[in-house]
Swiss-Prot record:
The gene is blaGES-5. Keywords: Antibiotic resistance, Disulfide bond, Hydrolase, Plasmid, Secreted, Signal. This is Beta-lactamase GES-5. Pfam families: Beta-lactamase2 (PF13354). Inhibited by the beta-lactamase-blocking agents clavulanic acid, sulbactam and tazobactam, via a covalent binding to Ser-64. GO terms for cellular component: extracellular region.
Length: 287
């Protein structure tokens, strides 16, 4: 009798979970219709197992979200002793491209340290600092090689900034899928890809990101711990990837959207709305 009772309870729980996932999908499809958008979402646990998703295997332009795994590659080089965080990277005015606030600020000195460039790339989305790091690691091909090394067979970087943010429809260059990137986030933060010191530093940078107050974290409860890296592309691309801790559970998340008919502010609001849909799912399934 107890066995039958347990089976009934398990069946009820499974049915409730399936219902919440259906609501998750329905809510995202409604947003897509209302905003004339495509929305890709993947939420995974620390082991990379899927919690929920939508258009998970569809390719989207990475935009600046790749700057998080780029920083992870830099930390891996530091951890292995092939790089030093305090090494000075010399550069000139040719390194200043569109949106390079920190690179411009350090130009008078003629250099940034490796860690200064990595932090600027993550927290400010500084394109000049990003290109400086790409120069040091061996270019976009080295970034793609790192993706492969940590088990991501999908994500690819082909160009530097700002060209990699063109987001031309049908162009496979500089793209990823939500599930590939969510699992890359999980691998970096929870899978032992970096030392604990490096992991803690990059988590702190993500939590202190200065470009994402209006995106995912705007749609999450204030008591969740959230760290993220945004991305903006031409042709309506607005993305956000990272991690969140809800009710003592850790998750990695990747959200990629394309909404060419919306304004920049409306695209931020769209990503925040996706955050609200994710919140509803997590709070319902964690009861």
């Amino acid at each position: 009798m107890r066995f039958i009772h347990a089976l009934l309870l398990a069946g009820i729980a499974h049915s409730a979970y399936a219902s919440e996932k259906l609501t998750f999908k329905t809510d995202l499809e409604k947003l897509e219709r209302e905003k004339a958008a495509q929305i890709g979402v993947a939420i995974v646990d620390p082991q990379g197992e899927i919690v929920a998703g939508h258009r998970m295997a569809q390719r989207f332009a990475m935009c600046s979200t790749f700057k998080f795994p780029l920083a992870a590659l830099v930390f891996e080089r530091i951890d292995s002793g092939t790089e030093r965080g305090d090494r000075k990277l010399s550069y000139g005015p040719d390194m200043i491209v569109e949106w390079s606030p920190a690179t411009e600020r350090f130009l008078a000195s003629g250099h940034m340290t490796v860690l200064e460039a990595a932090q600027a790339a993550v927290q400010l989305s500084d394109n000049g600092a990003t290109n400086l790091l790409l120069r040091e690691i061996g270019g976009p091909a080295a970034m793609t090689q790192y993706f492969r090394k940590i088990g991501d067979s999908v994500s690819r970087l082909d160009r530097k900034e700002p060209e990699m943010s063109d987001n031309t429809p049908g162009d496979l260059r500089d793209t990823t899928t939500p599930i590939a990137m969510a699992r890359t986030v999980a691998k970096v933060l929870y899978g032992g890809a970096l030392t604990s010191t490096s992991t803690h530093t990059i988590e702190r940078w993500l939590i202190g990101n200065q470009t994402g107050d209006a995106t995912l974290r705007a749609g999450f409860p204030k008591d969740w711990v959230v760290g993220e890296k945004t991305g903006t592309c031409a042709n309506g691309g607005r993305n956000d990837i990272g991690f969140f801790k809800a009710q003592e559970r850790d998750y990695a998340v990747a959200v990629y959207t394309t909404a060419p008919k919306l304004s920049a502010v409306e695209r931020d609001e769209l990503v925040a709305s996706v955050g609200q849909v994710i919140t509803q799912l997590i709070l319902s399934t964690d009861k």
